[in-house]
C-alpha cells in the first residue's frame, strides 16, 4: 500500500496519480476521511486509558471512605476504554481497507492513459526479412514435432500444450540460459512454491483488478501463482533485511498458471497466451533511494537477453492506466513477430517502490538504526513465450530454425533445429 504519511501530507499527489491511471479519486477522499477518523478514535482511546490509569493510582492511595466511589468510577472508565478501543480497532480496519483500494503512486514521467497510450523508449535490431513466405510459430513447431496443441487440449482443455522433443529441449535451454545470466549477475536462484496463502497473494497486489485471472483452490484456500514474483515477494514477509552490503537479488524459477480471463478469442493459436508456462523471474529488495537505478539494471539484463537471442525488439514505458496496482512504473520489452507484423510483449520489469513491502511487512534498517519498508522490483529473464519469437525470427525456407549462437551451448552445440521429417528420412 502507499505511504500513509504521503496520503496525509500530500493527498494532491495521490489524486494526481489516480487521474493519470484513469482511476477513481473518490477512494483517496475516502482514505483521507478514514485516516482522520482513525486518529480521532485513537486519541480518544489513549485519553480514556490514561484517565483510567490515573484513577487506578488514586484508588490505591484513597482512604476507606472514598474507595467505593473511585472503584465505581474506574469500572465505568473501564467500560468506556473497552468501547473506545473497539472503535479505534474498527477505525484502523476501515483505514486499512480504504488504503488497500488505492494503487501505487506512479513515478513522475509515466505517460497518462490506458493500454494504447504507452511511450516508446527505443527500438533495437533490424526486423527480419525473408525471401519466402514465413510460417507462424505453431506451424514451425509442428514441422519440428516440437509443439502439440491437439493433445494438450485433449488432456487439459483449451490453451494447454505439450512441448515435445526439441521443443522441450528448447524451453529448458532458454531457461538455463537465463539462469546462467542471473548467476553471472549475482542473483540467488530459488525454485519457488506455486501455491501461496491469500495474504501473500493479496500482499503482492494480485487480488485486485486482476483477481479473475488467478486460480484458487477452494478446499485449501490457496492460490496458484501466475508468476514467481508472488512467492519471491512473500519470501521475506514480516522480516527486517540487512541491505548494508547492497540489494538482495533472487531469480525464481517456477511453473506459472493464469486463467487468461478476458482474453476470449485472443491469441487462440499456439503458445502466446496459455494457462501454464515456465518463467524465470528476477526479484530485487533494495533501498528505496536506489529503486529507479535497479529498475534500469533489470531492464538492461532483459535487453541483453533479447540481443543475444538475435531478436528485434522495442522497449515501451507502459501508461499509468495499464499498470497493475503494485507497479509505479513498468517497462515492457516487445519482440517483433514476423507473421503478425507486430511487436508482442515478451517480458516486462516493474518498480513497485515500497507498495508490496508495506503490505507484507518487509523492512530494512537504515544507517540511523530505524526500520522502514524496502523497495521491491521484478522482471522476467526467460519464459515459454519467447519460443514464439525465436522460431519465427530464425526460421528458414525448409522449415528448419537456426539456433541463436548464445543458446547453442545449452542445446549441446546444436546449430539448427531440423524438421522431423528430414531427421526421420536419414
From Swiss-Prot:
- For ATP, which residues are the binding ones? 258-260, 274, 345-348
Its EC number is: 6.1.1.11
Location(s) in or outside the cell: Cytoplasm
Q: Which GO terms describe its molecular function?
A: ATP binding; serine-tRNA ligase activity
The pathway to which it is assigned is: Aminoacyl-tRNA biosynthesis; selenocysteinyl-tRNA(Sec) biosynthesis; L-seryl-tRNA(Sec) from L-serine and tRNA(Sec): step 1/1
**An example Gene Ontology CC term for this record:** cytoplasm
Q: Which positions in this protein are listed as binding L-serine?
A: 227-229, 281, 380
* Pfam families tied to this protein: Seryl_tRNA_N, tRNA-synt_2b
Judging by the UniProt lineage, the source's domain of life is Bacteria
Cytoplasm recorded as keyword: yes
Q: Its biological function?
A: Catalyzes the attachment of serine to tRNA(Ser). Is also able to aminoacylate tRNA(Sec) with serine, to form the misacylated tRNA L-seryl-tRNA(Sec), which will be further converted into selenocysteinyl-tRNA(Sec).
Q: Which family does it belong to?
A: Belongs to the class-II aminoacyl-tRNA synthetase family. Type-1 seryl-tRNA synthetase subfamily.
* Name of the protein this chain belongs to: Serine--tRNA ligase
Species of the source: Clavibacter michiganensis subsp. michiganensis (strain NCPPB 382)
Task: Quote the gene name from the UniProt entry.
Answer: serS
Amino acid at each position: 500500500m502507499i505511504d500513509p504519511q504521503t496520503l496525509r501530507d500530500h493527498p494532491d499527489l495521490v489524486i494526481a496519480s489516480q487521474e493519470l491511471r484513469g482511476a477513481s479519486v473518490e477512494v483517496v477522499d475516502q482514505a483521507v476521511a478514514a485516516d482522520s477518523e482513525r486518529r480521532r478514535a485513537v486519541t480518544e482511546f489513549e485519553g480514556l486509558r490514561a484517565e483510567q490509569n490515573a484513577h487506578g493510582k488514586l484508588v490505591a492511595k484513597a482512604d476507606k471512605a472514598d474507595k467505593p466511589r473511585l472503584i465505581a468510577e474506574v469500572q465505568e472508565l473501564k467500560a468506556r476504554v473497552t468501547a473506545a478501543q473497539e472503535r479505534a480497532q474498527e477505525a484502523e480496519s476501515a483505514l486499512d481497507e480504504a488504503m488497500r483500494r488505492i494503487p501505487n503512486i506512479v513515478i513522475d514521467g509515466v505517460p497518462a492513459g490506458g493500454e494504447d497510450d504507452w511511450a516508446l523508449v527505443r527500438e533495437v535490431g533490424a526486423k527480419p526479412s525473408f525471401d519466402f513466405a514465413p510460417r507462424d510459430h505453431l506451424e514451425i513447431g509442428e514441422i519440428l514435432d516440437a509443439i502439440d496443441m491437439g493433445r494438450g487440449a485433449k488432456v487439459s482443455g483449451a490453451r494447454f500444450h505439450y512441448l515435445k522433443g526439441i521443443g522441450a529441449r528448447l524451453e529448458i535451454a532458454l531457461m538455463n540460459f537465463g539462469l546462467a545470466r542471473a548467476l553471472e549477475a549475482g542473483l540467488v536462484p530459488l525454485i519457488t512454491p506455486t501455491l501461496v496463502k491469500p495474504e501473500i497473494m493479496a500482499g503482492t497486489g494480485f487480488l485486485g483488478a486482476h483477481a479473475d485471472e488467478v486460480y484458487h483452490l477452494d478446499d485449501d484456500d490457496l492460490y496458484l501463482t501466475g508468476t514467481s514474483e508472488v512467492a519471491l515477494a512473500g519470501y521475506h514477509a514480516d522480516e527486517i533485511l540487512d541491505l548494508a552490503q547492497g540489494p538482495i537479488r533472487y531469480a525464481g524459477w517456477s511453473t506459472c498458471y493464469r486463467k487468461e480471463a478476458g482474453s476470449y478469442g485472443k491469441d487462440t493459436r499456439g503458445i502466446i497466451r496459455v494457462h501454464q508456462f515456465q518463467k524465470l523471474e528476477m526479484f530485487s529488495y533494495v533501498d528505496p533511494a536506489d529503486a529507479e537505478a535497479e529498475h534500469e539494471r533489470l531492464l538492461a539484463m532483459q535487453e541483453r537477453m533479447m540481443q543475444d537471442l538475435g531478436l528485434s525488439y522495442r522497449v515501451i514505458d507502459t501508461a499509468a492506466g495499464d499498470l497493475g496496482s503494485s507497479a509505479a512504473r513498468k517497462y515492457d520489452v516487445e519482440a517483433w513477430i514476423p507473421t503478425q507484423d507486430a511487436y508482442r510483449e515478451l517480458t516486462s520489469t516493474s518498480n513497485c517502490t515500497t507498495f508490496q513491502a508495506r503490505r507484507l511487512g518487509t523492512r530494512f534498517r537504515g544507517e540511523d538504526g530505524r526500520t522502514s519498508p524496502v523497495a521491491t522490483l521484478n522482471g522476467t529473464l526467460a519464459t515459454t513465450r519467447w519460443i514464439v519469437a525465436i522460431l519465427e525470427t530464425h526460421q528458414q525456407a525448409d522449415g528448419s530454425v537456426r539456433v541463436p549462437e548464445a543458446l547453442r551451448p545449452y542445446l549441446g552445440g546444436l546449430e539448427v533445429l531440423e524438421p522431423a521429417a528430414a531427421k526421420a528420412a536419414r
